[in-house]
């Protein structure tokens, strides 16, 4: 088994009527949780990292871990650049072996978004690397980028078709009412807008900001055309809260091999639930 691109993975999901979850990881332990759970459930998953994660862990280190785990568990894996914005940064990581990229230029005007994305697509496709881009903006925070929810822009269905055709992307991230981070109250998703986008665009569609969404909402988005579900904050919250609880209850604990187990277990529960919500168990 080896590190693969997301293109075939998402095309299979689109044909099969399920979604592939993209789990944001940060270190060895969080990667172990995702890969072990996916392998046990025979589920396709995407291992995602923001620029901050790649800076923290190191691109070569992450690639080596993914490759080793794919072989160990006989499970195809994808490592994905999540919310990357700089061409040179993306190019360097692609040359190092990354096979899946999200170029996020959604903060730019429409024409500039197209231009920036097309530059990345033209480069990445030379290396058989799949490219995702976003049209519209989500509220909330990703790494150090903050978007006020009042300023978040929903995806225009007609523009989505023009955007997809002009850039040559392999998948499209849409803004339909989700946000990065956890929700203070239940979000109201614009399913009608999503249906219209699907009518205009035949590419696999991506939903960011899925942490905290109900099973009903996730499964409804999949029925309408979402093929990739991104989860980050919910994983961090489960991991960190379980770790805090353990250390509070066991102040004498000093061995990370012991005190990280409860954190991994809590995160594993979230990963298992998201895989079930996405309907991708047994699809790898």
UniProtKB/Swiss-Prot annotation:
Reaction catalysis annotation: D-tagatofuranose 1,6-bisphosphate = D-glyceraldehyde 3-phosphate + dihydroxyacetone phosphate
Gene: gatY
Residues that hold Zn(2+) according to the record: 83, 180, 208
InterPro entries referenced in this protein's UniProt entry, alphabetically: Aldolase_TIM, Class_II_FBP_aldolase, FBA_II, TagBP_ald_KbaY/GatY, TagBP_aldolase_GatY
UniProt remark on cofactor binding: Binds 1 zinc ion per subunit.
Quaternary data: Forms a complex with GatZ.
Keywords recorded for this protein, A-Z: Galactitol metabolism, Lyase, Metal-binding, Zinc
Protein name: D-tagatose-1,6-bisphosphate aldolase subunit GatY
Gene3D superfamilies reported for this sequence: Aldolase class I
Cytoplasm keyword on record: no
Pathway: Carbohydrate metabolism; D-tagatose 6-phosphate degradation; D-glyceraldehyde 3-phosphate and glycerone phosphate from D-tagatose 6-phosphate: step 2/2
Record: active site: 82
The organism of origin for this protein: Escherichia coli O139:H28 (strain E24377A / ETEC)
